[in-house]
Every structure is written in C-alpha cells, then in structure tokens.
C-alpha cells in the first residue's frame, strides 16, 4: 500500500518537540507529529482534590481542547455548548491516567499538576501526541519542584508515550494520519512505558471485527513506534534524563547532562 505521505507501514510521521514553549507554565511544549500540532502545559497547584486530602499524595489531572479551526472546517468551542463532549472527557481522562501510571504520587506530596493540552492543528493522533508531549511538560514541572527544594527527587518511575496503529485497506499501519484513520477497518491507540509495559489500549473494529493475531501484530507495531518516540523524549530531556526513574535521592543528585535546548 502506498501511504498518502509516502511513509513505510512502520514509519512514524516527523516529530518535532519545542520545549519551554510557554513562558508562564512550569512545564510546556509544542509537539508536532506530522501536521498534528498540540501545545501542552503543566501547572502546579499547592492543593489536591478532596478525595486526596490528608493522604499525603499528589494528583495529576488533565484538560484537553481544540482550537475551533484546528480542523478543516470550524468547530465551535465546547464552552459555547455549555459542556465538554464525551470525546473530550474520554481524552482528558486518558491523558491523566497515562501520566499517573509513571508518577510516584507519594513523593509528589499534596500538590496537583494540571496538564492542559490544546490542539492547534489536527491531522490524526491528537490524543497520542498530547500524552507524548505532556510527559515532557510534566517532567520539567517536576524538576522545578526539585530545584526549589519542595520535593527530594523527580517522582517519575519511567517514561510514557503513545501512538496510534490501525488496519487500512488490509494493511497494518503505524501513526495514522486523519485520512488514514477515517478509512481504517481497525483503529487503535496504545500507551506504553519505556519498559514495554502497557498502560492502555483503545481498540475498535470500525469496519468489522479483527482477530487475535491482528491485535498481537498491532501491539508489536505500536511498541516499535513507542520505542522510537521515547528515544526522542529522552533526547529532548537530555539535561534531566538521568534524574528520571531514579530510586534513591542520592543517585538523583548526580550531575545532569548539559542541555541541548
């Protein structure tokens, strides 16, 4: 199958991540995956939701939205409709769950980190790009807490990223564009850690059922893509990468690599 943009079946779209995109947020990025572009910010609050009060644990939560003209035709802001759509709620929860899976909330303490993802241009994979970009914004925000002396170490147990896979015209493809996604027999979003652990799988037989072998093949394809994405995350976070996934405070105090940003 010849893909629209000439990619191989297992080839990611070009990825560009601009760190510190917003000067006010404790962590921020602009992530570009092909023609999909998302601004992700991480903001720290010195309080937690009521269900976390008194536990000593922090919380990571997310909001997600799209610029009205992020798509080919204008879509009104959801605030004008009075409530977020079911899709928006689903994506917000997915982003929050994905990030919490690699955060030690005990080390964070009773703080909330708000992850805000705003899609400024959508060409497929907005939720997966949001997760991948938000992880970097979150890491920078957590590092600022360490630098201020508020927490002893970056409470990240590892890296997390996401990618879409699917079956289009009988072909298993990695990182679907909007047009590919629209024509997919099977559409799947996969979230994984740098250890190859699965955080979440969202898979649907849009055009019909699929087999266990299809599922296995798509997961392998997603794992291959996520490994590449996490390598990019580590390059972007080169100045603090040695502080991520560290068990002891002593090891966390080792000299970081020099920044490339």
From Swiss-Prot:
Entry annotated with the keyword tRNA-binding: yes
Coiled coil: none
Source organism of the structure: Thermoanaerobacter pseudethanolicus (strain ATCC 33223 / 39E) (Clostridium thermohydrosulfuricum)
Function of the protein: Phosphorolytic 3'-5' exoribonuclease that plays an important role in tRNA 3'-end maturation. Removes nucleotide residues following the 3'-CCA terminus of tRNAs; can also add nucleotides to the ends of RNA molecules by using nucleoside diphosphates as substrates, but this may not be physiologically important. Probably plays a role in initiation of 16S rRNA degradation (leading to ribosome degradation) during starvation.
Catalytic activity field: tRNA(n+1) + phosphate = tRNA(n) + a ribonucleoside 5'-diphosphate
GO BP: any one term: rRNA processing
Pfam families noted in UniProt: RNase_PH, RNase_PH_C
Protein family (similarity comment): Belongs to the RNase PH family.
Swiss-Prot/TrEMBL keywords: Nucleotidyltransferase, RNA-binding, rRNA processing, Transferase, tRNA processing, tRNA-binding
Superkingdom assignment: Bacteria
EC number per UniProt: 2.7.7.56
Annotated phosphate binding sites: 87, 125-127
Disulfide bonds: none
GO function terms (MF aspect): 3'-5'-RNA exonuclease activity; tRNA binding; tRNA nucleotidyltransferase activity
InterPro entries hit by this protein: ExoRNase_PH_dom1, ExoRNase_PH_dom2, ExoRNase_PH_dom2_sf, PNPase/RNase_PH_dom_sf, Ribosomal_Su5_D2-typ_SF, RNase_PH, RNase_PH_bac-type, RNase_PH_CS
Subunit comment: Homohexameric ring arranged as a trimer of dimers.
Name of this chain's protein: Ribonuclease PH
First-level EC class: transferase
């Amino acid at each position: 199958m010849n893909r629209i943009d000439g990619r191989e079946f297992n080839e990611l779209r070009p990825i560009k991540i601009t760190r510190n995109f917003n000067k006010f947020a404790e962590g921020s990025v602009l992530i570009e995956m092909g023609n999909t572009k998302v601004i992700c910010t991480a903001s720290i609050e010195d309080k937690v939701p009521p269900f976390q009060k008194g536990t000593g644990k922090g919380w990571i939560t997310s909001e997600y939205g799209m610029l009205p003209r992020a798509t080919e035709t204008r879509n009104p802001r959801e605030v004008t409709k009075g409530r977020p759509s079911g899709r928006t709620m689903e994506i917000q929860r997915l982003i929050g769950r994905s990030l919490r899976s690699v955060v030690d909330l005990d080390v964070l303490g009773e703080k909330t980190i708000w992850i805000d993802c705003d899609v400024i241009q959508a060409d497929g994979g907005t939720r997966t790009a949001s997760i991948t970009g938000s992880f970097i914004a979150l890491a920078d925000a957590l590092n600022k807490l360490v630098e201020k002396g508020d927490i002893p170490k970056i409470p990240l147990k590892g890296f997390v990223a996401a990618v879409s896979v699917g079956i289009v015209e009988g072909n298993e493809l990695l990182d679907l564009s909007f047009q590919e996604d629209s024509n997919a027999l099977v559409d799947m979003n996969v979230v994984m850690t740098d250890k190859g652990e699965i955080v979440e799988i969202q898979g649907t037989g849009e055009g019909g059922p699929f087999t266990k072998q299809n599922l296995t093949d798509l997961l392998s394809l997603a794992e291959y893509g996520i490994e590449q994405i996490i390598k990019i995350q580590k390059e972007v976070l080169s100045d603090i990468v040695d502080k991520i996934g560290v068990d002891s405070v002593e090891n966390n105090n080792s000299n970081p690599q020099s920044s490339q940003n």
